[in-house]
C-alpha cells in the first residue's frame, strides 16, 4: 500500500520555506538536529513497511531528511512507532529539551467531510534512557511517555494549494536524567503527520562579564538557581561595600539572574567603554581611590608622567598643604609684601603694606612681623637684638590676616628694623626662607602720652598725688623729664618733675583741677596728653555731739531689726512655695515614670491593633469632644480643630484626625500605628497625643493643637521675617525630637517640613508617624517591599535599595534644613524625580539658599554624605546647633553661591550662553524672585540687558543688601564665563 501522501513533495517544499522561530536568550548546546543531517537518518521503523517512512527533499542543493506517516486509508486502529538513534548526553546536563517541527492534516479535509474512521490529529512522544546503544530492539515497554503532541494549526488540501500551510513547533523538556544517553520514540495512533525536524539540546548560562567580573559557562542545576562566583577582571577589585566575591545565579532556563556584588577598577584605572574591562589612566590623569568613578585630569601645577597613576605629583617649587587631598591643585609660597610703609604718633608706630603680587595660588596668606632694636643704623652694621617684652603688637605679631599692625612700647631715640613676612600653608614645605620686606625706623626725640592716662593715687583737701606711664631713655646721655600743666577756674601753673609721679600741694579744698603732662627731651618738648580732671576732698567736718551719736545708733538698730523681720517673713513664705513645687514635681515625675517605663514596641506585635493602641493611649469619651472646623482633609479622612474637656479639667484646643469608614484595612492599621507611636513619647518636640477614640466610628486620634500649622506653609507666609537665630532654634527643636526618636530605635521615613508642626511660640514638633517603623537596634535597618517614596527627601540608598536607617533620616533632616533656610521653597525646583535621582548619583547637591549662614550649609552637606556612615548622628546635630545658637556671630558668614549651580526650570531655551529666556525665570532660579518688579521698573526685560549690570546699578534699583547683590552679580559673571 502506498504510504506517502498525495501532493507530499509540494507540501514539504512549503514547509521547508516557512520561517524558523527565533532562538532563546540562553546558550543552547545541540545534541542532535535532523535538519543538519548529511545522510539518511536510519531510524528504527515499527512496523517497517506500513508505518513511518523516511523522505528526502533537496533544498538549495542540500538534502533534507524527514519522516512522514499517513495511515488514514488503512482503517481501524493504528500503532506505528518511530525510534531515533541513540543520543549521547554525556555527564553534564541533567535536563534536555526536544524541539519538534511538524505538520498535521485536518481530518475533515479528507473526502466525506467528517474524516475517515480512526483519523486523529495528534501523536505521542516517548523516551528511554540507556548507558549505551541497544541496537535495533525497540523495547516498547521501557519507553516513558513525555507528552501528546497536538498541532496548533492543521492544514487542508485548499491550504496546500494556496501555499498557506504553516509549520507547528513543539518544545518540551526532559528532566532528572541520569544515564549517559537516551532514545526518542514517536507513536502515531492514526494521524496524517509529517515530522520535518527533531532537535535535541540542553541550555546553559553563557560566559559573560557583569560588573567587571567574569562568569564562566555554567550548566543549570537539576532544580532552582545555581550560585556562581565571579572573578574580577584584570586591574579590578571587589567593590567597596560589597559583601564578598561577586556572584550571579544560573537559572534552569540558562539565564543569569540575581547579581550580587560587583568589582571596581583599582586606583589608577577606570572602566573602559562598554564596561568590559579596566584601562589605565592616561598620562596627565589620575584616579586616587575606588570611590572616584573616572580618571580625573591632574590639578593645576601637578603632573602624572606615567599611565595608571593614582596621584599627580607637584611640579618643582609647588606643594600641597598637610591635609589637602590629591584633587587639590599644587601651590607655592607667596612673594614678599609690597609697599611696606609706616606712620608714627609719639612712640606708637603703625605699619602698613600691600598683599604680595604673587599669592602662590592660595587665599590663606598670613603675615608675621619681626622687630629688631639696633644701636646706630642697622644698614650700617650696627648691632641689633630682638625687641624686648615691652614692645606690643596689635592685633598680634604673627598669624595676621590684615595688612596693618600697630606697635606700642617703643623707646625714643632708638633705631628699629621691622621685617614683614608673607606665608601660607605651604611655606613650611619650601626649603627657602619666606619672602619678606624690611623697613628701618628712627623713633626720633619725643614721646607722646596721648594714649596714656593719668591716675589718681591719693587725694586730700589740699593735695593730689598723681602718676602716669613713662619711658626711660636707652641711649647714653638721653635725659627725660616731664612738664605738668595744672589749672582751675582761678589760676594755672607749670611744674617740672623727673619721674612719672607728682605730688601737687597747696591746693584749694573741694576744687576741680585740670591736669595734663608731656615729656621734655634734649631736642624739645613732646605733645601734651589729654586733659584729666581731679577734685580735691572737701574740708574736714566738725565732730558730732553726744545726742547726735545716740540718734544715729538708735536709727541703725531700728533698721537692722526691720531687715531681720523682712528676711524671716520671706524665708518662711519661700519655704512653703518650695514645698508646694516639690509636691508638684513629684506628681509629674511619677506620671512620666509610668509613661517611660513602657517598652517601645511596634503595633505589629499585637493581634488586635486597637488593643495595642490603648496600651499607650487613653480611650476618650466622645462626649468630652467638641468638633469645630476642618483644617485639613485627605483621601481617607479629615483633620478638625476642636476642643477637649476632660473631667475636672479646663477645656483645651486640640486637633482631631479622623479615618473614614470606607478606608482600606491597611490605612486603618497605619492609623492606629501612628497613635501607638505618639503615645510612647513625652517629648517637647514630638507631637503630644491626648487620646484616641476606637470604640465608635469614625476612629479618631486627638493631639495637641499647633497654632501655626505645618512648617513649610508657615515659612512661606513669613519669608524674611525670621532672624537666623530663630531659624536655628526651630531646627534645634526638630533635631532634638528626631534624636529622641532615633535614640529609641525608631526611623521616621517621611521627615519633611510639611510633617513638622509649629505652635504659637515657634516651637517645632515632629509629627505624621504613618511611615515610622521600629528598628531592631540603634544601627538597624528597615527594608520595605513597596509603596511610594518621597524622592526629594529620601537618601539615595533608601531610593535604590528601599533600606531605611537613622542615617537616612539624617539625610532628610538636611533637606528640612534647606527648606527652613529657603523659607519653604520646593527642594530641587521643577526637576523631575528621575532627574533628582540621577543628579544625586552624579554628586549634585542643593545650592545654599539666599543669605544662608555658612555653618548651616556645611551642616547640610554633612547630612548629604553619599556614604551613610559619614553622616552625623542627631545627637551631634543637636550639639552643633546648640553651639551655633550660643555664638550668633558665627551666623554672619554667608555661604558662597556658585552661579553655575542653579535649580533647573522647565524652560531652558534662552540665547547662547544664557540658559533662561526671561529675567523673571532667571531671578527665580537664583532665589531672587522678590526683585522681579525692581528689574521691570528699571526697564530690564531681556536677559541681554542684565549682562552689563554693576553693583552701583543694583543700588540705584533699590537692591542694597550686599549678599543679594553678590548673588546676582555672581550669576551674571557665570553667563560671561
Swiss-Prot record:
Residues 333-446, 448-539 form the Fibronectin type-III domain. It is a single-pass type I membrane protein. CDD domains: EphR_LBD_A1 (cd10479), FN3 (cd00063), SAM_EPH-A1 (cd09542), TM_EphA1 (cd12841). Residues 570-977 are cytoplasmic. Residues 914-977 form the SAM domain. The keyword Hydrolase does not apply. Receptor tyrosine kinase which binds promiscuously membrane-bound ephrin-A family ligands residing on adjacent cells, leading to contact-dependent bidirectional signaling into neighboring cells. The signaling pathway downstream of the receptor is referred to as forward signaling while the signaling pathway downstream of the ephrin ligand is referred to as reverse signaling. Binds with a low affinity EFNA3 and EFNA4 and with a high affinity to EFNA1 which most probably constitutes its cognate/functional ligand. This is Ephrin type-A receptor 1. It comes from Mus musculus (Mouse).
